[in-house]
């Protein structure tokens, strides 16, 4: 999400197209919502513009990180029921869904996102809570490290602003970096 001023904002493709001249703000930091007003705008954009749905007619499932604070879950539920008038809501942990997506109910899930990496042992679809671990390290940290390396070498990537440079490095990272399944062969 990009915020120009308090009354004008861009989300999604419009934000990407104008990223060189806009200030970028993410309402989620290290897996936790920090800006509820903008999260509400994002959900409105998703439900109305992207999905073209009638929220009153559909239950919603929301994924959440391992250690999502209960107060955040309650606040999000309040927004969904009171603002969007949804009939039902289900929260599920991303680690469990990641394992389900691979067709398994028992295993070990590693989920590395923008600001968090989470480790979760799962047995028959249930989290084994004594083994849960979360590290505040993710893709944004790798982007910042690559950006620092470029700055330390005197590189300037964008004539516009530092935010745009970060997005350029993020694009390079996403197109060039990968996780190998056969480390020894590489």
Model-derived regions, located:
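Gly/Thr-rich phosphate-binding beta-strand-loop-beta motif of the actin/hexokinase/Hsp70
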Residues: 1-2, 8, 100-127, 146
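Active-site or ligand-binding cleft "flap/edge" segments
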Residues: 50-51, 83, 100-104, 141, ...
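Conserved phosphate-binding loops in N-terminal lobes of ATP-dependent enzymes
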Residues: 1-79, 88, 118, 129-131, ...
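Conserved, well-structured core segments
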Residues: 60-63, 99-100, 179
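Helical "lid/coupling" subdomains associated with nucleotide-phosphate turnover
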Residues: 29, 33-36, 81, 98, ...
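Phosphate-binding glycine-rich/basic clefts of nucleotide- and phosphate-handling proteins
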Residues: 123-186
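Structured beta-strand/turn binding interfaces of compact recognition modules in eukaryotic regulators
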Residues: 27, 63-66, 92-94, 102, ...
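Conserved phosphate-binding catalytic cores of ATP/NTP-utilizing and phosphoryl-transfer enzymes
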Residues: 72-74, 86-110, 126
């Amino acid at each position: 999400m990009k915020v120009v001023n308090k009354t004008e904002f861009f989300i999604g493709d419009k934000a990407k197209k104008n990223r060189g001249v806009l200030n970028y703000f993410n309402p989620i930091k290290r897996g936790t919502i920090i800006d509820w007003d903008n999260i509400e705008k994002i959900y409105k954009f998703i439900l109305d513009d992207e999905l073209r749905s009638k929220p009153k007619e559909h239950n919603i499932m929301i994924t959440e990180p391992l250690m999502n604070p209960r107060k955040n879950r309650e606040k999000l539920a309040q927004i969904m029921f009171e603002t969007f008038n949804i009939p039902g809501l289900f929260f599920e942990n991303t680690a469990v869904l990641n394992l389900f997506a691979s067709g398994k109910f028992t295993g070990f899930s590693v989920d590395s996102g923008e600001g968090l990496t989470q480790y979760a042992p799962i047995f028959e679809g249930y989290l084994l809570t004594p083994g849960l671990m979360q590290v505040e390290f993710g893709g944004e940290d790798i982007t910042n490290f690559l950006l620092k390396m470029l700055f330390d070498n005197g590189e300037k990537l964008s004539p516009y602003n530092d935010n745009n440079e970060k997005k350029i490095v993020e694009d390079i990272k996403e197109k060039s970096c990968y996780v190998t399944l056969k480390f020894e062969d590489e």
